[in-house]
A protein has these predicted regions:
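Active-/binding-site microenvironments in catalytic and ligand-binding cores
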Residues: 1-98
Length: 98
């Protein structure tokens, strides 16, 4: 997973949207749960996500077909589904080619 520090570093470089084809941006929860049992530190839970409390950004998980994209030369748009009173939700992500 991506740590809070690594996420903040990306944001400091000008990144405003992150995405992954993995289940989560953070470390697998089984790993985090084991680490939490040892440290009792709540800051390690969803630490990559918590970077958004320091500096706002948008994040997309569970992307697919990334292997079909070229290394550059396209734009990405995300079309969210409206969810009443939600703080997160589904988006349809598309790559736009010239």
């Amino acid at each position: 997973g991506i740590s809070k520090e690594a996420t903040i570093y990306l944001l400091e470089q000008g990144v405003r949207v992150t995405g992954t084809d993995a289940w989560s941006w953070d470390a697998p929860f089984s790993y985090t749960a084991e680490k939490f049992k040892k440290t009792k530190d709540p800051a390690i839970i969803w630490e990559g996500h918590r970077a958004g409390m320091v500096q706002g950004y948008s994040h997309i998980e569970k992307l697919n077909n990334l292997d079909k994209l070229p290394s550059h030369g396209f734009k990405v748009s995300a079309f969210p589904f409206k969810i009443k009173n939600g703080s997160a939700g589904f988006v349809r992500v598309v790559a736009i080619f010239k």
